[in-house]
Amino acid sequence: MGSSEAETPAKANKASAPQEQQPPATSSIATPTVYPDWTSFQGYPPIPPHGFFPSPVVSNPQGHPYMWGPQPMMPPYGTPPYVIYPPGGIYAHPSMRPGAHPFAPYTMTSPNGNPDAAGTTTTAATAGGETNGKSSEGKEKSPIKRSKGSLGSLNMITGKNCVEHGKTSGASVNGTISQSGESGSESSSEGSEANSQNDSQHKESGQEQDGDVRSSQNGVSPSPSQAQLKQTLAIMQMPSSGPVPGPTTNLNIGMDYWANTASSSPALHGKVTPTAIPGAVAPTEPWMQDERELKRQKRKQSNRDSARRSRLRKQAECEELAQRAEVLKQENASLKDEVSRIRKEYDELLSKNSSLKDNVGDKQHKTDEAGLDNKLQHSGDDSQKDTN
């Protein structure tokens, strides 16, 4: 025991010796002043700053409160940070995930997976709990629970237990019951009991009930106008065999249609059921046929008008060409007459020229003969004188 007690003071002295040597080393490094409330500020805007080039001279570790510290050439670990964030050397960033701040440029995510930029997120579990709490009185709960953000349970997809889901989906957060949920659930339940082959109707009703559940979970109850618009509009089925009765059509159907007033317009053959909404108009088959016939007649009339215009244009061009041909024929005839007259004059001039040439040649020949005779006489007289 005595040896162990003697060894412990020696170890304590050895351990205290390095601790006494460390303070001079740490005291030589100046520690920067850090304000405790800097982590709660979003001090950097989302605009990316200009490029930063590190200087070769080591800067002061006590950085300016509005400037970044020296950026290292090599990142200390992992990938380098984004440009919009300063390097984490001197200033510490607030430990907040992107989108958690209400005024951040990122959308805030809600627990059910739907982004909400306004910052108001509703939990699907709480809304679903309220609706289930209000609608579970006197009703059995579904064996399969609905998960958060899911599109629907297995019963809705397969088309079973549509009555319970329709009634539960009809109850919204405000306690109002939408008419579409009840009507869809009743029609789907009756169809499943009457005939097991109407799977498509069950799927459609399940989709409508799923949409109502999602709207009630988001805290939006359908308004009376929306409930009225969701009601099914019944249209009278027309007989498929034989031609569909419609108003008689003629060539002036367009003029009659536009000229008649509202009071004199013929009544439609289609019938609207008493359950139809006054604001919604169900187009019947005769009305559609009348519109198609009217469009066809208008198209035919426009084609006839364009053909008539083109025919008149061609006729006018032909008449103009015929008139020009007549004028050119008359000019050609006059030119031919003038050419024939000029040719006659030319022939007359040629005959006169030939006659003049003949006269001139005869006169010259006579003068030449007379000159030769005179020369011969003079030469005979000279020879007689020489002989004498």
From Swiss-Prot:
Its main location: nucleus. Probable transcription factor that may be involved in responses to fungal pathogen infection and abiotic stresses. This is bZIP transcription factor 1-A. One of its GO terms (molecular function) is DNA-binding transcription factor activity. PROSITE patterns: BZIP, BZIP_BASIC. It comes from Triticum aestivum (Wheat). GO terms for cellular component: nucleus. InterPro entries: bZIP, bZIP_plant_GBF1, bZIP_sf, GBF-like, MFMR. Induction: Induced during incompatible interaction with the fungal pathogen Puccinia striiformis. Induced by abscisic acid (ABA), ethylene, cold stress, salt stress and wounding. Residues 302-316, 359-369, 375-388 have a biased composition (Basic and acidic residues). GO terms for biological process: defense response; regulation of DNA-templated transcription. Highly expressed in roots and at lower levels in stems and leaves. It is found in: Nucleus. The gene is BZIP1-A. Residues 117-129, 180-193 have a biased composition (Low complexity).
